[in-house]
Amino acid sequence: MKKLLLVLVAVLGLSFAANAQNIGGRFGGVGTSKNGANVGYNAELSYQHYLSGPNRLEFDLGFSRNNDNYVNFAIGYHWLFPIAGDFSWFIGPAVNLGYCNNDGFGLAVGAQGGAEWNPKNAPIQLAVDARPVYEFLLPDHCAYNGFGYGVAFSVRYRIH
């Protein structure tokens, strides 16, 4: 059993090392909940891992500055489509797991889509995106309970 686990970890590690990755921050300044409450400014640590073809996974760990002390972990799957030159757009499903003000966990399903710039001669990525979600299982006072969305600007370092 230990050998099988070791082989599995090695294979997963090599697959992550073989593909390009992006790491950086995602900063949101716009957002609302179903009751129109402003959700405040949010920041997320962001990691993208490219899969085969023009597809990738995105992992985000976020924090909210509003009074709910909301912590969020999001996973998204993106399909990428070229626009022109170094520009492309992406869209895909997303799942969020959140924790609100020591009152409980929440689960959200939604989507994420946006546009990005990956200059060929610089190891950065700049992007803007929107993430509409429907969040449930949270206490009623949490800002994200029900339908909500967020718009964000991202800056990431590209690792090839």
Predicted segments, located by residue:
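Cleavable N-terminal export/targeting peptides
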Residues: 1-22
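Outer-membrane beta-barrel translocator domains and adjoining extracellular loop/strand segments
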Residues: 36-39, 71-75, 102-107, 138-146
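Feature marks short, surface-exposed loop/turn motifs that line or immediately flank catalytic pockets
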Residues: 31, 65, 99, 134-136
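Outer-membrane beta-barrel porins/channels
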Residues: 130-144, 160
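Outer-membrane beta-barrel "beta-signal"
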Residues: 146-160
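Gram-negative (and chloroplast) outer-membrane scaffold detector with strong preference
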Residues: 48-128
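First exposed extracellular module after export/assembly in secreted or surface-exposed proteins
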Residues: 26-28, 123, 127-129, 147-149
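Short glycine/proline- and aromatic-enriched beta-strand/turn motifs that initiate or cap beta-hairpins
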Residues: 16-65, 160
